[in-house]
Amino acid sequence: MAALLSWMNLALYVLQLVVNGHSSRTIGPMSRRYETLITPAPYAFSIWGFIYTFLAATVIVDCFWSSLSFFTSAPNANVLRTLFAISCLMNMGWIVFFTNEYVNAATATLVILWFSLFALYAHIVTERRDTGFDIKRFVFSELGLTVYFAWTCAATLISFAVTAQYVAGDYLSLSSYVALLSVLSVGTLSAVIYEGDVAFGLVAIWALVGLAVKSTTLEARVELIAMNIRACATQSAAIVSAFIVIAITHKLLTPNRHFQPLQSGAPLYGDKPIGYGTTHA
C-alpha cells in the first residue's frame, strides 16, 4: 500500500506541474485583476520554481530512496501520503477555480490545501524534535514541503484579502490588512522561535520584502494605505530577520551536551548485610 501511494503521489505531482504549466499565462493576469494591497511584487512569485524543484525531490525520494523520506519513519505514513495527494488535488483545484474567477471557491480550496500541508509540516517538526536534525533528509525530503507550507501561509492570507475585497467591492481598511500581516508575522515567529525553522522564516521574509518594495500607482486615499502597509511589511521583515539571527546564534553558541542518565543507584538501605572486612553493616 505504501509503495502504491508513493507512486500515486508522483503521478499526481507530475499532473499538478502540467496543470500549472498549462495555466501559467492565465494566472498572472488574473492575479493582477484581483490584486490586493498585501500582494507582493511579481518577482516574489518566482519562489514557485524553488518549491516545485524541491517538492519533486520529496516525491522522487519517497519512491526510490524511502530511507531518506520523512514519510517512511512516520507511524501513520499512509495517512501522510494521502494528505500529500489531497494537497496536489487542492493545488490543481485552486488553479481551475481562480482562473475561472470563482474567487470564493478558490479561497476555500486554498484553506483545505493549507490544512493538509499543516498536518505534514507538524509531523516534520515533531519528528525532528524526537529524532534530531538530519541534513540529508532535510534537503531531499523536508525542505520542499517546508517552503511550500510557508508560502501557502502567505498565499492563504492574500486569498482571504481577495475574497474580502471581492465581497466589499473595494479595498479594505488599513487595520484589516495589518491584521492579516500580523497573523503571518506571529506564525513565522512561532516557527523560528519554538522550532528554530530558519527556512520558514526566510520564506516569510521573501514575501514581506516583496510587499515592502512593491511599487503602486493608486488614488491618494488608497496609496496612503498602501504606503502604511509597506512600512508594516518592512518592520515585520526586520523583526523576523532579527529572530532568525538570534536563533542561529543560539544554535551555534549553545553546547550540545549529552548526559547518560543513571540506570540505578546504590541502595541506601537494604536487608542484605554489606561486608567491610570483618565488620558487617
Per-range role (PLM):
Residues 1-10, 48, 202, 232:
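N-terminal membrane topogenic signal
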Residues 39-44, 170-187, 193, 212-245:
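Membrane-interface transmembrane-helix boundary segments in multi-pass integral membrane proteins
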Residues 94-108, 166-171, 192-195:
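Membrane-interface helix caps and helix-loop-helix hairpins in membrane proteins
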Residues 118-127, 152-166, 180-195:
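Alpha-helical transmembrane segments in multipass membrane proteins, preferentially the mid-helix core
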Residues 200-211:
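Central hydrophobic cores of alpha-helical transmembrane segments
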Residues 256-281:
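Non-transmembrane, juxtamembrane loop and terminal tail segments
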